[in-house]
């Protein structure tokens, strides 16, 4: 017999399946139903799915419900409409903590001796007054039964992804389209740590709400026609993208009424608010030419205007051109020579940066000085008002030949890529008051040969 941490007497001996017996058998169920209908002019499909998961960790579960719709209809000989949308709702109770969190169940369980039955902790994790029973003197390994029975967290997420398209055919070879897309979700998370928890003896509660929305509007005009031996296709279009992220976090310290899970039940409440916005306007196009199914030429262009760059640098243009020649079509068919193609391409690609890298960012401290709010610089990085877009230039030539009915072949490529004005956050001396600085860095080049 041995005395355990609360002076109870228990039998001494090795405990079989000591850690395994703490966990439950995980169960996941999925149910789905779908409806669809089609006729000569229209088609649609609606589906509903529901997933429930009861985790191996006691008191932890997840549920997710999704509803999807997809349909199209031909309103006239020239006009067609398509739409699709998916809505999902997810609810999670008590996500298990990970890594070095004090409430990580694994950290506490792996530290239990083989002769100490973890079930002894289940009836002694708190005393008769509701206070935590300190079983090991380690605030980083909290009693796992206190974690699952007294501490709690929950989250809910709503997400809507939708897209609608209009197609209009002016002629058989000239068509226009308009597309609008939306991706929006709200994530709400609450984390409750009761009074007397090691490391949080006064209690703590955190509520977080994240709202994210991104939408795109795009218009395109397409042309495709054959002129004698030439195949011609082209399109030109424009796109507008807007992104917005908003976060609100409230943290309550020092609980007033023990056990009451409400953010107003704390004597100290800190609020953090963040708002990030980005917009990109684009114009793009492509022309493709084909001659007698052996010579091809493609040219593209794109011009982006990004809100994350300074007015003089926010518009950047990047084109490309590529061509190929299937020279095997120039000769009479040979049994030993199956296929041969030469190809070459050149392209430029541009890129912007994340929002708010051009100027200092400011925030307010949660406390005041004689009733006056205190402001501060929130970023630890030196901004750069003259950031340029990153540019990557690539060049490639190659040959693909095959013999003996594709039994033998050689694919050879030479490539070169040069990246200029990379946008980097580099470390600087902290004596400057900052830890990093935003810069456009020099030039990086790589080239090589590939053969297979």
Predicted segments, located by residue:
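Predominantly transmembrane beta-strands of Gram-negative outer membrane beta-barrel pores used
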Residues: 22-23, 30-52, 56, 68-74, ...
